[in-house]
Curated annotation (Swiss-Prot):
Part of the 30S ribosomal subunit. Forms a tight complex with proteins S10 and S14. GO terms for cellular component: cytosolic small ribosomal subunit. Belongs to the universal ribosomal protein uS3 family. Pfam families: KH_2, Ribosomal_S3_C. The keyword Transcription does not apply. It comes from Caldanaerobacter subterraneus subsp. tengcongensis (strain DSM 15242 / JCM 11007 / NBRC 100824 / MB4) (Thermoanaerobacter tengcongensis). Residues 39-107 form the KH type-2 domain. This is Small ribosomal subunit protein uS3. GO terms for biological process: translation. Gene3D superfamilies: 3.30.300.20, Ribosomal protein S3, C-terminal domain. Keywords: Ribonucleoprotein, Ribosomal protein, RNA-binding, rRNA-binding. GO terms for molecular function: mRNA binding; rRNA binding; structural constituent of ribosome.
Length: 221
């Protein structure tokens, strides 16, 4: 039942890296984990408009290094760096630790599954047809070099009485192949009929190199 598992769960340590890079003793682990969740939620809520698909947190003693991936880094940095300075001060006040922020630009947001899911959810909230939003996202991703993309929308689609799930896909999206670079994203659209869930899987190709064939000389035996 590999199709039921979060794509990152299978691939962490194989083709995906950890989003939290720190080690803690058993008694400290719960507090640090809760602090991580608070940091992620705060950054995501404050900078949602900048398009934040990924936040990587690295800890060392009394210092926290946070890598923020953004589709619109200018919105995070602000005029003359005021935005990022204000964010750093707020995070330091929240954690009582030294915070180092690193803003990384997402070059192709159309190939980021999380950003695609958030974009579709935003369009559904604006009463744009979910089918149109899904098909446009698929066309853009395939045009920019994706090997495959799958999108699923669940809920009371178009205000229907009975909730259902509709899926569209193009290309190849292998869920069992660990060497496949599968990006996964999830977002929710809040409509007058209730929440609509949007899931996106994007296949960016294979990561691990193919094994080289050994060529042996026939002579010299």
């Amino acid at each position: 039942m590999g199709q039921k598992v979060h794509p990152y769960g299978l691939r962490v340590g194989v083709t995906k890296d950890w989003l939290a890079k720190w080690y803690a003793k058993d008694k400290d682990f719960p507090n640090i984990l809760v602090e991580d969740i608070k940091i992620r939620n705060y950054i995501k809520e404050k900078l949602y408009a900048a398009g934040i698909p990924q936040i990587v947190i690295e800890r060392a003693s009394n210092r926290i290094k946070i890598d923020i991936y953004a589709a619109k880094p200018g919105m995070v940095i602000g005029k003359g760096g005021t935005g990022v300075d204000r964010l750093r001060e707020e995070l330091e006040k929240m954690t009582n630790k030294t915070v180092i922020l690193n803003i990384i630009e997402v070059k192709t947001p159309e190939l980021s599954a999380q950003l695609v899911a958030e974009n579709i959810a935003a369009q559904i909230e604006k009463r744009i047809s979910y089918r149109r939003a899904m098909k446009q996202a698929i066309a853009r991703a395939m045009k920019l070099g994706a090997k495959g993309i799958k999108i699923a929308c669940s809920g009371r689609l178009a205000g229907a009485e009975i909730a259902r799930t509709e899926r569209y896909h193009e290309g190849v999206v292998p869920l069992q192949t660990l060497r496949a670079d599968i990006d996964y994203g999830f977002a929710e659209a809040n409509t007058t009929y209730g929440k609509i869930g949007v899931k996106v899987w994007i296949n960016k190709g294979e990561i691990l190199p193919q094994p080289k064939k050994q060529v042996t000389a026939e002579g010299g035996k």
